[in-house]
Amino acid sequence: GTLLLLLSEALALTETWAGSHSLKYFHTSVSRPGRGEPRFISVGYVDDTQFVRFDNDAASPRMVPRAQWMEQEGPEYWDRETRSARDTAQTFRVNLRTLRGYYNQTEAGSHTLQWMHGCDLGPDGRFLRGYEQFAYDGKDYLTLNEDLRSWTAVDTAAQISERKSNDACEAEHQRAYLEDTCVEWLRKYLEKGKETLLHLDPPKTHVTHHRISDHEATLRCWALGFYPAEITLTWQRDGEDQNQYTELVETRPAGDGTFQKWAAVVVPSGEEQRYTCHVQHEGLPEPLTLRWEPASQTTIPIVGIFAGLVLLGAVVTGATVVAAVMWRKKSSGGKGGSYSKAEWSDSAQGSESLTACKA
C-alpha cells in the first residue's frame, strides 16, 4: 500500500511538472559617485516568469509581487523578503568599495556588481543542478563550480574572495541552500502559480521573404506567441543544417507573457524551395517543418511584427539591463522565504569574508 502510494505521488508529480523548471535570482548594484547610495535592483524568476522585484530607488523600497499568483502571499513573507533584499543591498555597497580597492580604481567612476544564483528541478521533481555566479563591471568574477563545493576565480583579485569564501565554508552553506531550500521554494512557487507557469502555448509560425538583390533573398522563419521560452529554430538546405549560415536572434519577451524569436538565412534567388525551417517547442505535438509560400507573402503583418520587436527591444533593454547583465540569485534562508542572504560581508577593518558556516 505504501509503495503504491509513493508510486502514484511520483506519477502525479511527473505529470504536473513535465519538463525541467528553475528558480533564479538576479541582483545588481551600480555605484553612483556623488549621487548617494548605489542603485540596487533584485528580481526573481520561476522559469521565464518574473515573480518578485526590489528596487531601492522606489518611493518605498520593498520586495513586491510581479506575478498575480504571488499577490496572495501575506505580510510576513514580504517583510522577510524585503529585509533580505535590504541586507544584500548593504553588503553590495560595501563590496563595491572593496572591489574598487582590489582593482586599484578611483572613486570617480561608476562600477557594477552582479550576483546570480538558482536551482533547477528535473522532470521527476527532484534537484537537477544549482548555480551561483558573481560579476564585476560586466565580467565574470567568481563562480560556484558544478560540484557546489568549490569556487573558480578568474583573476588575482577574485582569488582573494575565493580564499575567504573557502575559509568561511560558504560553498558548503550554498550547497545546502541550492539543493534543499531553493528546491523547496521552487516546488511551492510551481504549485502557487501552476495555472500560469505550467501552461503551454505553441508557437505561431510562418516564413517571410525579403529580396536583397536580383541574385539573393533573405528567408526569415518566425515563431511568435509561445511559452515557455525554450525553442529551437533550424534552417536546412536539402536536408542539411545551415547553422553556420543562420542569423538567430535571442528569444524575446512579447510583453504578454509569451515569447518571440526568428532565424534567417540568405539564399540564392530561385532556390528558396530548397530551404526548410524546423521548429521544436514543448507546446508542439511534433516538430514543424516550414517553407516559404510565395502565394501567402504579405508585407503588412511583417512590418507590424518588426516594429513591435523594435519597440520590444527598447522595453526589454530597460527591463533587463539589470537582469541580463547580471544573473539570478538565491532564495530564502532556513526560516522560509525564497531569498537567500548575500555573499560577502566586509568587516569594519575592510577585510572581505563570506558568512561563516554555523556549527
UniProtKB/Swiss-Prot annotation:
Glycans are attached at N104. GO terms for molecular function: peptide antigen binding; signaling receptor binding. Residues 201-292 are annotated as: Alpha-3. The chain crosses the membrane at residues 303-326. Residues 293-302 are annotated as: Connecting peptide. Its main location: membrane. It comes from the Eukaryota. Disulfide bonds join C119-C182, C221-C277. Residues 327-359 are cytoplasmic. It is a single-pass type I membrane protein. The keyword Transmembrane applies. Heterodimer of an alpha chain and a beta chain (beta-2-microglobulin). This is Popy class I histocompatibility antigen, alpha chain E. It comes from Pongo pygmaeus (Bornean orangutan).
